[in-house]
Amino acid sequence: MLLTHLNEENQPKMVDIGDKETTERIALASGRISMNKEAYDAIINHGVKKGPVLQTAIIAGIMGAKKTSELIPMCHSIMLNGVDIDILEEKETCSFKLYARVKTQAKTGVEMEALMSVSIGLLTIYDMVKAIDKSMTISGVMLEHKSGGKSGDYNAKK
């Protein structure tokens, strides 16, 4: 497969998307943060001194999606139509699963924005609770679904 971010001299370049068609693009990404029971209970019971952890993670995830092109060198700056984040409580494993759905009308997809949104949301949870549990783990950050564009739809294997 040809790497599109390299020119003929094997040097980095940003792909020219000028001739591509503007279409609706949607991406859904997810990831998980696991922690000890004390940290999990502190989040659920709103006992974290830094404030409301899950609400802050949602805001951070939205900000992460908006800042993606500033942090990933070959990522195009695109207008986002919406970012929707859900955080599921997983009591039995003392973890939270974060989903980010990003939508746009553009010439390129929003997979990186969805993945960045998940990553920043989970890192925010870690930051806010690290005083209680430094051994938290972030895992399984992945693209679940994408639609729109020339390459068509993608659904992760379950």
From Swiss-Prot:
This is Cyclic pyranopterin monophosphate synthase. Homohexamer; trimer of dimers. Signal peptide: none annotated. Belongs to the MoaC family. InterPro entries: MoaC, MoaC_bact/euk, MoaC_sf, MoCo_biosynth_MoaA/MoaC, Mopterin_CF_biosynth-C_dom. Substrate binds at M74, C75, H76, M112, E113. One of its GO terms (biological process) is Mo-molybdopterin cofactor biosynthetic process. It catalyses: (8S)-3',8-cyclo-7,8-dihydroguanosine 5'-triphosphate = cyclic pyranopterin phosphate + diphosphate. GO terms for molecular function: cyclic pyranopterin monophosphate synthase activity. It comes from Helicobacter pylori (strain G27). Keywords: Lyase, Molybdenum cofactor biosynthesis. Coiled coil: none annotated. Gene3D superfamilies: Molybdopterin cofactor biosynthesis C (MoaC) domain. Catalyzes the conversion of (8S)-3',8-cyclo-7,8-dihydroguanosine 5'-triphosphate to cyclic pyranopterin monophosphate (cPMP). Its EC number is 4.6.1.17.
